[in-house]
Amino acid sequence: MTAHIAPATVPPSAPAAAGQDPAALLAHARREVLEAGRGLDEAGVLAVLRLPDEYLGDALALAHEVRMRWCGPEVEVEGIISLKTGGCPEDCHFCSQSGKFDSPVRSAWLDVPSLVEAARQTAATGATEFCIVAAVRGPDARLMSQVREGVAAIRAAVDINVACSLGMLTQDQVDELTAIGVHRYNHNLETSRSHFPKVVTTHSWEERWETCEMVRAAGMELCCGAILGVGESLEQRAELAAQLAVLEPDEVPLNFLNPRPGTPFGDYPPVQPRDALRAIAAFRLALPRTILRYSGGREITLGDLEAQGMLGGINAVIVGNYLTTLGRPAESDLKMLADLSMPIKSLQATL
């Protein structure tokens, strides 16, 4: 299958030209995004990423208005579980699950009863989505067999949507996952096309894009997002937002680098909180109708400022722990949503 690749850059439009007055930029974004429902182009996103601190509150407020108008008030809650941890043959430089780095993560498999119990616990939080993740380049026959068995067992026992994240897929694998009832498939672009070779060398950005296109064509929902703080420039963050806008995923998870010991990016600094909030606002203004999910690294990046992201465009969260790092307790996130008077999306609303 030939991948339809997004352009590396999008020509800037006049209203978002470099050096534009911040107030004029936000007025333009209000007209284009809030009122007309058209996401900002690459130049507009870059301008938001460059906003001075004194305009950050206005950008977050506008992004929240956009989220409320085009997505509604509800927040989607998801839990994730690692079916196969560690020993991955790929060299994603931020990931402690790569077998190429001297990280403390060791290879392990989870059995099907444990998957079902994790799905039950996730559903008990009010979550509507449960994602089965495997640290692989792509699924082999053994993994596909485990996934078939696990998805069937979860669907028989728990009232929750099942998603998967199993790496790059063949068309036959896409068709099989669709047939067994996988609701959504996660496959992140991670970073922009121009920066990707500095983050991963064992496969290409284009290979990831092709899997995403196959998933969309098969009728599964597509979850495709980013990890910020992996050495990319602001221009490359804007490039990624524009590429995601071309792909039109149903969901974009925003991860922030949580530096892992033993990985090439293990000594990178976390994204600064204000830069993270600018990115949240910018991605919402680029993707007005998309589920924008708080994902890994938000705790170390934002700390006590997480609620500002929820009031700046975020409308979904992963609760509990991540794959190899600790998250906040589910109760803490649910309390945050309650304190912000943000209702949790019901299962029926996701179908």
From Swiss-Prot:
Keywords, comma-separated and alphabetical: 2Fe-2S, 4Fe-4S, Biotin biosynthesis, Iron, Iron-sulfur, Metal-binding, S-adenosyl-L-methionine, Transferase
Binding site for [2Fe-2S] cluster: 131, 164, 223, 293
Gene Ontology molecular function: 2 iron, 2 sulfur cluster binding; 4 iron, 4 sulfur cluster binding; biotin synthase activity; iron ion binding
Radical SAM core domain boundaries: 73-298
PROSITE patterns, alphabetized: RADICAL_SAM
The protein's Enzyme Commission number: 2.8.1.6
Gene3D superfamilies: Aldolase class I
Names of the cofactor(s): [4Fe-4S] cluster; [2Fe-2S] cluster
InterPro entries cross-referenced by the UniProt entry: Aldolase_TIM (IPR013785), BATS_dom (IPR010722), Biotin_synth/BioAB (IPR002684), Biotin_synthase (IPR024177), Elp3/MiaA/NifB-like_rSAM (IPR006638), rSAM (IPR007197)
Annotated residues for binding of [4Fe-4S] cluster: 88, 92, 95
Reaction catalysis annotation: (4R,5S)-dethiobiotin + (sulfur carrier)-SH + 2 reduced [2Fe-2S]-[ferredoxin] + 2 S-adenosyl-L-methionine = (sulfur carrier)-H + biotin + 2 5'-deoxyadenosine + 2 L-methionine + 2 oxidized [2Fe-2S]-[ferredoxin]
Alphabetical list of SUPFAM superfamilies matching this protein: Radical SAM enzymes
Cofactor-binding details, from the entry: Binds 1 [4Fe-4S] cluster. The cluster is coordinated with 3 cysteines and an exchangeable S-adenosyl-L-methionine. Binds 1 [2Fe-2S] cluster. The cluster is coordinated with 3 cysteines and 1 arginine.
Pathway involvement of the protein, from the record: Cofactor biosynthesis; biotin biosynthesis; biotin from 7,8-diaminononanoate: step 2/2
BP term (GO), one: biotin biosynthetic process
Record protein name field: Biotin synthase
